[in-house]
């Protein structure tokens, strides 16, 4: 069975991964938006 400590570690790792995924998405989206405006 999963202990409380294992569940806490898993949820923290998952939260950090999702946060970094959102930050990377916004970073990529902002850069592609600026470059597409400059080329038009």
UniProtKB/Swiss-Prot annotation:
Could you tell me the keywords of this UniProt record? Endoplasmic reticulum, Membrane, Signal-anchor, Transmembrane, Transmembrane helix
The transmembrane residues are: 5-25
Annotated Gene Ontology cellular components are: oligosaccharyltransferase complex
Residues in the Lumenal compartment per record: 1-4
Query: Cytoplasmic topology: which positions?
Result: 26-40
Cell compartment(s), UniProt: Endoplasmic reticulum membrane
* Domain of life per record: Eukaryota
Q: Which InterPro entries match?
A: Oligosaccaryltransferase (IPR018943), OST4 (IPR051307), Ost4p_sf (IPR036330)
What processes does the entry annotate via GO biological process terms? protein N-linked glycosylation; protein N-linked glycosylation via asparagine
Q: What SUPFAM superfamilies does this protein map onto?
A: Oligosaccharyltransferase subunit ost4p
Q: Family assignment?
A: Belongs to the OST4 family.
Report the protein's function: Subunit of the oligosaccharyl transferase (OST) complex that catalyzes the initial transfer of a defined glycan (Glc(3)Man(9)GlcNAc(2) in eukaryotes) from the lipid carrier dolichol-pyrophosphate to an asparagine residue within an Asn-X-Ser/Thr consensus motif in nascent polypeptide chains, the first step in protein N-glycosylation. N-glycosylation occurs cotranslationally and the complex associates with the Sec61 complex at the channel-forming translocon complex that mediates protein translocation across the endoplasmic reticulum (ER). All subunits are required for a maximal enzyme activity.
Subunit structure, as described in the record: Component of the oligosaccharyltransferase (OST) complex.
What's the name of the protein? Dolichyl-diphosphooligosaccharide--protein glycosyltransferase subunit 4
Q: Which organism is it from?
A: Drosophila virilis (Fruit fly)
| Lineage of source species | Eukaryota, Metazoa, Ecdysozoa, Arthropoda, Hexapoda
């Amino acid at each position: 069975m999963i202990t409380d400590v294992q569940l806490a570690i898993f949820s923290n790792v998952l939260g950090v991964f999702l946060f970094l995924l959102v930050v990377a998405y916004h970073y990529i989206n902002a850069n592609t938006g600026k470059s597409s405006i400059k080329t038009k």
